[in-house]
Each structure stands twice: as C-alpha cells, then as structure tokens.
From Swiss-Prot:
Topology in the lipid bilayer: Multi-pass membrane protein
Organism: Spermophilopsis leptodactylus
GO molecular function: metal ion binding; ubiquinol-cytochrome-c reductase activity
Cystines in this chain: none
Keyword line: Electron transport, Heme, Iron, Membrane, Metal-binding, Mitochondrion, Mitochondrion inner membrane, Respiratory chain, Transmembrane, Transmembrane helix, Transport, Ubiquinone
Cell location: Mitochondrion inner membrane
Binding-site list for a ubiquinone: 201
Similarity remark: Belongs to the cytochrome b family.
Protein name: Cytochrome b
InterPro entries on file: Cyt_b/b6_C (IPR005798), Cyt_b/b6_C_sf (IPR036150), Cyt_b/b6_N (IPR005797), Cytb/b6-like_sf (IPR027387), Cytochrome_b (IPR030689), Cytochrome_b_C_euk/bac (IPR048260), Cytochrome_b_N_euk/bac (IPR048259), Di-haem_cyt_TM (IPR016174)
Transmembrane parts of this sequence: 33-53, 77-98, 113-133, 178-198, 226-246, 288-308, 320-340, 347-367
Pfam families: Cytochrom_B_C (PF00032), Cytochrome_B (PF00033)
Binding-site list for heme b b566: 97, 196
Reported cofactor(s): heme b
C-alpha cells in the first residue's frame, strides 16, 4: 500500500515541498534563512492578530490602547514586544537571505529572484505602516515625512499624497487605512512566499559551489528539517533575549510620547532596518532625486541577473568578487550608521560617498571584476 502522504491531494503538496523534496547535499547554514523567514512571518501574524484584538485605530485612542495592551492585557507586553522585535529579526533574516542570494548567484533563477524582490518591497511597506500604528511622536512624523516623499512625483504628486492621507494632513483617516493595510499585507506576503517556493521548486535549490547538483541530492526530511530546527532554536533564543532583557534596544524613545503635530523631535529617523535607504535618500539634496535613489537602491536587485558577467555562478571560487562583496556589506553598514546620525558636517559627506560607492560597486566595479576574473582563468 502506498503511503498516504504520497497519494492524498493535500498531503502530497506538503510531501513534495518539505519531506521528499530532493535537496543538494552540500548547502550550508546560509540556506536556513528561508525557513526562518517563514517562521518569522508566522510569529508576526499570530502576535499581530492578538494585538489587533485590543488595538483601536483612532488617533485619540491608538496610543492609549497600546499602553493598555502593555499594562492591562495578560502578557500583552510580551505579545507587543515579540511583535516589535520580531520585525527586527524578520529583517535580519531577510538581509542575510538576500546577501546569500547575491554571494552564491541564486539570482540566476529569475522568477524566484524577482518574486523575492517584490516580497522585500511588500515587507518593507508592511513594516513602515506597522510603525505608524502606535501613534507615538516618531510614528506620526515618520508617516508624514515618508508619505510626503510622493509629492516629489511631477504633476500628480500633491494629489497622490492627499489621496493617501485621506485629507490635508496625516490624521484619523490615514491611521485607519494604515491599520487596514498592515493587517491584510502579511497574508499577501504569505501568498507571495508560496509563489516564491513554487518557482524555486521548479528548478531546485542552488548550492555554495553554484554547480549543478542533480547527481547528489538527498531528501529534505530528516536531514534539513533537523538543520532548520537548530536555526529556529537560535532565532527564538535571540528573539527572546531581546524581548525579555532589552525590548526597547532597537526602538526610539520619542515613540513613548504621544503624537503631537505642533512639536517636532530634533532628529527624525526610521527603524534601524530602513536606515541604509534613509541615508541614501538624504545624501541627495534634490527631493525627486533622493526619492528615485531610495527606490532604486532596492530595485537595483532586479538588475543583478543582467549585470552577472562571470562564467561562474557562485562567488565561492572568485576572490576578487568576494572582496568587493564584503566591501559592499561594509558600505551598507556604514550607510546604516549614517542614517541614524544628524545631518551635520562629517556625516553628510560620508553618507554621500557611501551612497556613490554602493551604486558604483553594483553597476560597474562588480561586473568589470567578473570579466577580469574570466580573463585570469582564460575562460
């Protein structure tokens, strides 16, 4: 008799995705982040659901409803901080997942990669709208500043911003619609993640060497299920240390002040995971130019398959490209640091240089280095 997991229509899908899936035998811990992102999404949806049961999306009561969750709801503080820090863990996993894709040339799977970029944009949009919901001072000003960027779009900009706001300023209508979108988008992300997996399973996973691994594949279960559980335990450990020991480490103290349109904090800055993009935005004095640079700083990921000039897929055997990759990582860390600094003398020029370096490495230096490597290897 055939096993039910191979015959039952539903169990068959799960079987082909997580149990009998042929997987390369040499994939490293860098391949753990896909499953960790799935776990992060589940944690965020569950904690978010329980928060939504107690939250009110009205400008007069939003801030106090969050206070009520933290003080009066059973384990409300735990749910709230798991949700807030869960977002940080989500982005850490996302950045590492994308970095892995860049390093090992996974972007040659066009459909999987492009859906991944769309996923990145969707997660960023969701996180931004979630940050507005507590209606603290930084929430309010973040919403005002970031939505205002759309006014840089020629001709339709101002109308577009007022349409998004639902009025002439960030107010009750804005908060309500942000809550609605913040609630629905994680489910859109889950659906997109399924499409992401669908396309990935058409081709099979890449591996550190970038070579075809059809000759040596092993079943996903038990080998990689065990490996993923280890990753999960580390993720939960780090998240819970963050939540239980320093839940406000990554937050902004200004967000403990209720939003006041008449008062502006000296430094407006987003959450840490947007700082690199924020630094690129600020490094261009022109509003429209800044917005374009901001969008292109992430949209540039779509160009990687086109810019790939090497005869090898992975960077595993390409020391020159490896060196440039780590310079790019250091550059992104520099941008993240600059994004959190005030707009003053040394920081402005550092931010501008780091932004120029970011685009130059990706668009020019990496493709040229790959060609040089081809020449050196006489390919």
């Amino acid at each position: 008799m055939t096993n039910i997991r191979k015959t039952h229509p539903l169990x068959k899908i799960v079987n082909h995705s997580f149990i009998d899936l042929p997987t390369p035998s040499n994939i490293s811990a860098w391949w753990n982040f896909g499953s960790l992102l799935g776990i992060c999404l589940i944690i965020q949806i569950l904690t978010g659901l329980f928060l939504a049961m107690h939250y009110t999306s009205d400008t007069t009561t939003a801030f106090s409803s969050v206070t009520h969750i933290c003080r009066d709801v059973n384990y409300g503080w735990l749910i709230r901080y798991m949700h807030a820090n869960g977002a940080s863990m989500f982005f850490i996993c996302l950045f590492l997942h994308v970095g892995r894709g860049l390093y090992y040339g996974s972007y040659t799977y066009f459909e999987t990669w492009n859906i991944g970029v769309i996923l990145l944009f969707t997660v960023m949009a969701t996180a931004f709208m979630g940050y507005v919901l507590p209606w603290g001072q930084m929430s309010f000003l973040g919403a005002t500043v970031i939505t205002n960027l759309l006014s840089a779009i020629p001709y339709v900009g101002t109308n577009l911003v007022e349409w998004i706001w639902g009025g002439f300023s960030v107010d009750k209508a804005t908060l309500t619609r942000f809550f609605a979108f913040h609630f629905i988008l994680p489910f859109v992300i889950a659906a997109l993640a399924m499409v992401h997996l669908l396309f990935l399973h058409e081709t099979g996973s890449n591996n550190p060497t970038g070579l075809i691994s059809d000759s040596x594949k092993i079943p996903f279960h038990p080998y990689y299920t065990i490996k993923d559980i280890l990753g999960l335990l580390i993720l939960i450990l780090v998240l819970m240390i963050l939540v239980l020991f320093s839940p406000d480490l990554l937050g902004d103290p200004d967000n403990y002040t209720p939003x006041n349109p008449l008062n502006t904090p000296p430094h407006i800055k987003p959450e840490w995971y947007f700082l690199f993009a924020y630094a690129i935005l600020r490094s261009i004095p022109n509003k429209l130019g800044g917005v374009l640079a901001l969008v292109f700083s992430i949209l540039i990921l779509i160009l990687f398959p086109v810019l790939h000039t090497s005869k090898q897929r992975s960077m595993m055997f390409r020391p020159l490209s490896q060196c440039l990759f780590w310079i790019l990582v250091a550059d992104l860390l520099t941008l993240t640091w600059i994004g959190g600094q005030p707009v003053e003398h040394p920081f402005i020029i550092i931010g501008q240089l780091a932004s120029i370096l970011y685009f130059t490495i990706i668009l020019f230096i990496l493709p040229i280095a790959s060609m040089i490597e081809n020449k050196l290897l006489k390919w």
